[in-house]
Regions:
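DPxDG-like acidic metal-binding loop motif
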Residues: 110-134
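Alpha-helical scaffolds flanking conserved acidic
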Residues: 98, 134-137
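ATP-binding N-lobe of GHMP and related small-molecule kinases
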Residues: 1-108, 130
């Protein structure tokens, strides 16, 4: 099974930065601007576990400059999957491979954290054939 979803970014014109917290979910910017087509594309594959294999989630994050190997960036996607797990929406007899493609730079006011979380949740809802809107999870 596989599902792909994307969410455009946002060019912020007026903003205030909130980076004091250690929690990535409490960081970011707030302001006004306009939406752009470039953003985040997320593809999720769900593969049945082999004999003796345990439930796992593998996250790969790619930018225009190459792969990102930063746990802080990956935590956003871990938080989304944990929310789905808490609500018992994931089949733990499957292994999940998540490929995230960031089309705009991080921490530059393009709304990439929100676009990433939303595209990931949309892809999971599609994969799981949920009728719930991703923003309701």
């Amino acid at each position: 099974m596989q599902a792909t979803a994307r969410c455009g970014g946002h060019v912020t014109l007026l903003f205030s930065i909130h980076s004091e917290s250690e929690d990535p979910l409490q960081q970011g910017s707030r302001g006004a601007g306009f939406c752009v087509e470039a953003g985040v594309e997320c593809t999720i594959q769900a593969i049945p576990l082999s004999e003796g294999e345990e439930f796992s989630v593998n996250i790969g994050i790619q930018t225009t400059d190459g792969p990102i190997d930063d746990e802080t960036v990956a935590l956003l996607y871990v938080d989304v999957i944990e929310e789905f797990m808490q609500r018992k929406l994931l089949d733990e007899n499957l292994c999940y491979h998540i490929d995230v493609t960031l089309e705009l730079p991080l921490s530059q006011g393009f709304g990439m954290s929100a676009a990433g979380a939303l595209s990931y949740a949309k892809a999971l809802c599609s994969l799981l054939e949920l009728e719930t809107e991703p923003t309701q999870i």
